Amino acid sequence: MINVLTKKHFLILFFGSLYGSLAAQSYLGFNVDNDLYFGSDRYYSSGIFLEYGFHRKVKSDSTNKKHFISKHWTLGQEINTPSLHKTIDKKDMDFPYSGWLFLRFSKERYKNSDFGFGWGVTFGVSGAEASLAKKMQNTYHILVLNLEELSWSFSIPQAFHINAQTSFSSGIIIRQNIKFVQQSHLEFGTFRIGAKTKFGLQLGNLQGLPFFGYRLE
């Protein structure tokens, strides 16, 4: 891990992720997922994400109370491959090749440090060529891994997609310095439909939730 600290900026390079604070309440990130970290290359094979966001306190017009708002932008690419990715025979593939290039905006509003909700919208394009997935993956395989090109003989077709997302986050104090926290997501649209939730215990006296954007304050 490499840390470079100055008075107003910091930069962290760690396992393919690059993050830097642009101001007290904002972040810029470059994040890479790759299943070769785990010695395999199938299904969700690669993800590359350029991220920017910020959060700030704002006053409500009616009550003059402060609440938190965070906004996030992500430019990303995801690649999926079958487990037998060297075959060119469709009947031997358990999963199609898939490329997904997208731009996402999301906004979260926290009425207090332990209760928040959000929404988001994603625009993108699928397809081996349009998403640049085939070119990106084969270039990486040839130049970095010294492997043969993958066939991409059967892939999800090229199309423009729109997806929407909602989220809900909360925290409940169990006892001093122990809090039960959860965050739930729902996504629906023309490219992906799904739901997920995560929960756990937050230890310590730090206010807020671990899901509150990238905590750089």
List each language-model region with its residue ranges.
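Transmembrane beta-strand segments of Gram-negative outer membrane beta-barrel proteins
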Residues: 24-32, 68-78
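N-terminal ordered "arm"
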Residues: 25-62
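Short regulatory "switch" loops immediately downstream of catalytic or recognition motifs
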Residues: 1, 54-59, 204-207
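Histidine/cysteine-enriched polar flanking segments
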Residues: 34-36, 40-47, 69, 77, ...
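Edge/loop elements at the starts and ends of beta-strands within beta-rich repeat scaffolds
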Residues: 66-68, 175
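Bacterial Sec-dependent N-terminal signal peptides
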Residues: 1-29
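Outer-membrane pore/translocation modules
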Residues: 73-217
